[in-house]
Structures are given as structure tokens and as C-alpha cells.
């Protein structure tokens, strides 16, 4: 899942860096593995 998120994030960050990264960043940061 990490690889997928990495690709998606890299692609999406160009459009919605703040909302997208913030959502996944918080989720994964709080211990949301996969």
C-alpha cells in the first residue's frame, strides 16, 4: 500500500498538496498502516 500511496501522493500533491497530503499524512501518521 505504501508504494501505491507514494505514487498517488506524488501525482496528487501537484493538484491538491494540502488536502490530500494532510489527510493521508494524518491518517498514516496516527498509525494507519495500509
Swiss-Prot record:
Role, per record: Snake venom phospholipase A2 (PLA2) that inhibits neuromuscular transmission by blocking acetylcholine release from the nerve termini. PLA2 catalyzes the calcium-dependent hydrolysis of the 2-acyl groups in 3-sn-phosphoglycerides.
Enzyme Commission code: 3.1.1.4
Cofactor: Ca(2+)
Family annotation (SUPFAM superfamilies): Phospholipase A2, PLA2
Name of the protein this chain belongs to: Phospholipase A2 B1
Alphabetical list of Gene3D superfamilies matching this protein: Phospholipase A2 domain
Expression sites (tissue/organ): Expressed by the venom gland.
Residues binding Ca(2+), per UniProt: 27, 29, 31
Biological processes per GO annotation: arachidonate secretion; lipid catabolic process; phospholipid metabolic process
Family named by the database record: Belongs to the phospholipase A2 family. Group II subfamily.
A GO molecular-function descriptor: toxin activity
Reactions catalysed according to its record: a 1,2-diacyl-sn-glycero-3-phosphocholine + H2O = a 1-acyl-sn-glycero-3-phosphocholine + a fatty acid + H(+)
Keywords from the UniProt entry: Calcium, Disulfide bond, Hydrolase, Lipid degradation, Lipid metabolism, Metal-binding, Neurotoxin, Presynaptic neurotoxin, Secreted, Toxin
UniProt xrefs under InterPro entries: PLipase_A2, PLipase_A2_dom, PLipase_A2_dom_sf
GO CC entries: extracellular region
Cofactor binding note of this UniProt entry: Binds 1 Ca(2+) ion.
Compartment(s): Secreted
Organism name: Micrurus pyrrhocryptus
Post-translational modification: Contains seven disulfide bonds.
Amino acid at each position: 500500500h505504501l508504494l501505491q500511496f507514494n505514487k498517488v501522493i506524488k501525482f496528487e500533491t501537484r493538484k491538491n498538496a494540502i488536502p490530500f497530503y494532510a489527510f493521508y499524512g494524518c491518517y498514516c501518521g496516527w498509525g494507519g498502516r495500509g
